[in-house]
């Protein structure tokens, strides 16, 4: 994927960049795989804000993605590579030989016309899915299950890939994109290759309005608020200390820099060999 930059004819276009979309082969989505997507504006069922800085944005339909890849030993042909407004990765439309159609995350290098397969023992090539126990060590993988049969939950964003580092007993050891080294049950499935659209991280929005199109609202600094609205608010001028401002805090009073918030008794902690911030 190439990134296009504009001539700086306006202040907004000076740094703005956007993808060329040259890998997209189909402009209209498959209607049978669409679902309505209602916006919440960051509110829960009581109408209270539970996720700040959300609201507005362009209307979208949800694309139903097959994260389970449980249609075993039935060949599928890649019919199209499509844009999905709900995620950073591109999606691929598969036509199975029995007539069913499904969307999957488009791996890096996937082309229209290729044949894909999922099952216990299939060819090791980008887009094929199989259990971790049958994947060779050192292979790049994505869309990894945390619980067998539940469907892929991690390593799904654009350009992401994990490396299968080891297998021992009932567990496989993975090196995740964050740097975390983690154990996963060996019967869990993963898809070969990395997720496509790796240049997504290099895109510059360029102007505030483009964030609004994505449904992201402006973010106000705590120091610019009043004391009633934020622990770091108030004071004369740009006060950096006093009145609870000595240590940066979240809007709810929790220390914002360096405080560990993960539950120490969490059961999955024993599966983390090395944390993402460990040296």
From Swiss-Prot:
Q: What is the recorded function of this protein according to its Swiss-Prot or TrEMBL entry?
A: One of the primary rRNA binding proteins. Required for association of the 30S and 50S subunits to form the 70S ribosome, for tRNA binding and peptide bond formation. It has been suggested to have peptidyltransferase activity; this is somewhat controversial. Makes several contacts with the 16S rRNA in the 70S ribosome.
A Gene Ontology annotation in the biological process aspect, one of them, is: cytoplasmic translation
Residue ranges annotated as compositionally biased, kind Gly residues, are: 232-242
* Keyword terms: Ribonucleoprotein, Ribosomal protein, RNA-binding, rRNA-binding
Q: What is the lineage of its organism?
A: Bacteria, Pseudomonadati, Chlorobiota, Chlorobiia, Chlorobiales
* HAMAP family per record: Ribosomal_uL2_B (MF_01320_B)
Does rRNA-binding show up as a keyword for this record? yes
Family annotation (Gene3D superfamilies)? 2.30.30.30, Nucleic acid-binding proteins, Ribosomal protein L2, domain 3
- What residue spans carry the Basic residues bias annotation? 259-279
Q: What is this protein called?
A: Large ribosomal subunit protein uL2
Q: How does it assemble?
A: Part of the 50S ribosomal subunit. Forms a bridge to the 30S subunit in the 70S ribosome.
The UniProt entry's GO CC annotations, sorted and at most eight, read: large ribosomal subunit
Q: What organism is the protein native to?
A: Prosthecochloris aestuarii (strain DSM 271 / SK 413)
The record's NCBIfam families line, in alphabetical order, gives: rplB_bact (TIGR01171)
Disulfide bonds listed in the record:
none
**Keyword RNA-binding annotated:** yes
């Amino acid at each position: 994927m190439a990134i296009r930059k504009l001539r700086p004819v306006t202040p907004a276009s000076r740094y703005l960049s956007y993808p060329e979309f040259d890998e997209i082969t189909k402009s209209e989505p498959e209607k049978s795989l669409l679902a309505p997507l209602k916006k919440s504006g960051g509110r829960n069922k009581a109408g209270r804000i539970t996720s700040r800085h959300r609201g507005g944005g362009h209307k979208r339909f949800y694309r139903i993605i097959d994260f389970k890849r449980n249609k075993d030993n039935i060949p599928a042909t890649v019919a199209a590579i499509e844009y999905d407004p709900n995620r950073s990765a591109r999606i691929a439309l598969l036509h199975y030989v029995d007539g069913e159609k499904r969307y999957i995350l488009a791996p890096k290098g996937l082309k229209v016309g290729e044949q894909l397969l999922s099952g216990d023992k299939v060819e090791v090539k980008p887009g094929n899915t199989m259990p971790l126990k049958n994947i060779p060590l050192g292979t790049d993988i994505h869309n990894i299950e945390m619980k067998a049969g539940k469907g892929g939950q991690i390593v799904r964003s654009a350009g992401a890939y994990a490396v299968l580092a080891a297998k021992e007993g009932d567990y496989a050891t993975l090196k995740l994109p964050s740097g975390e080294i983690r154990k996963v049950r060996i019967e869990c499935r993963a898809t070969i290759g990395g997720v496509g659209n790796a240049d997504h991280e290099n895109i510059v929005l360029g102007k505030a309005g483009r964030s609004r199109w994505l449904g992201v609202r402006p973010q106000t600094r705590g120091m610019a608020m009043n004391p009633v609205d934020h622990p770091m608010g108030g004071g004369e001028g740009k006060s950096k200390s006093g009145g609870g401002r000595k240590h940066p805090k979240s809007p709810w009073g929790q220390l914002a820099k360096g405080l560990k918030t993960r539950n120490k008794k969490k059961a999955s902690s024993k599966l983390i060999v090395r944390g993402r911030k460990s040296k």
